Swiss-Prot record:
It comes from the Bacteria. NCBIfam families: bL25_bact_ctc, PRK05618.1-2, PRK05618.1-5, PRK05943.1. Keywords: Ribonucleoprotein, Ribosomal protein, RNA-binding, rRNA-binding. This is Large ribosomal subunit protein bL25. GO terms for biological process: translation. It holds the Pfam family Ribosomal_TL5_C. The lineage of its organism: Bacteria, Pseudomonadati, Pseudomonadota, Gammaproteobacteria, Cellvibrionales.
């Protein structure tokens, strides 16, 4: 993990929909809840402006966050973000506590590289189809990757890459593959050019 994310939070006792609306409107704060582990859930609020800065980084969604709650630090991951349907406004956050000795499950984005220069596209005129854009992984918090790279340089038209074909970082495993071979999903396909086009991979 190459980035460190820190976010300040304030514990709150004034709960309910009305309190949350006032918090967002008058204090420019976002209501949130922290849960998980052996501790009781805690209701907090965070700065909306500060949060928006972090949300601009893809890694914020797949990274352990240092959440400072009134001077007490908690290691958490972002589990859910509720956004306003028409405004650039975050309505609520869910944070999950993590323990450095306990494995966690998290979706990590896939980064596809060398698409345009791959054998299947540049030489054979194929078309890339992304079957997955994120991968469910299981690992310790300190091993959680910001993203997983998928190199298409040597992939030919008509070829399908599955989860089992990916090179995962040390300490990281695919959650799907732990369920059996039937869950070895297609990740990316290069369709053949028209006239010799292959079928898209089914999950």
């Amino acid at each position: 993990m190459s980035e460190d994310f820190k976010l300040d939070a304030t514990a709150r006792n004034d709960l309910g929909k009305g309190a949350s609306r006032r918090l967002r409107r008058l204090a420019d704060q976002v209501p949130a809840i922290i849960y998980g582990g052996s501790k009781a859930p805690v209701n907090v609020s965070v700065s909306h402006n500060e949060l928006l800065k972090h949300l601009q980084h893809e890694a914020f969604f797949s990274h352990v966050i240092d959440l400072n709650i009134d001077g007490t630090s908690e290691s958490v991951i972002l589990k859910d973000v509720q956004r306003h349907p028409s405004k650039a406004q975050v309505l609520h956050l869910d944070f999950l506590r993590v323990d450095k000795n306990t494995k966690l499950h998290k979706q990590v984005p896939l980064h596809f590289i060398n698409e345009a220069t791959s054998v299947g596209v540049k030489t054979q005129g194929g078309k890339v189809v992304h079957n997955l854009t994120q991968l469910d992984v299981t690992c310790l918090p300190q091993d959680l990757p910001e993203f997983i790279e998928v190199d298409l340089a040597a992939i030919e038209a008509g070829q399908i890459l599955h989860i089992s074909d990916l090179k995962l970082p040390k300490g990281v495993i695919s959650t799907d593959l732990t369920k059996g071979a039937d869950h070895d999903l297609a990740v990316v396909t290069i369709l053949k050019a028209k006239g010799g086009e292959s079928e898209e991979a089914a999950e």
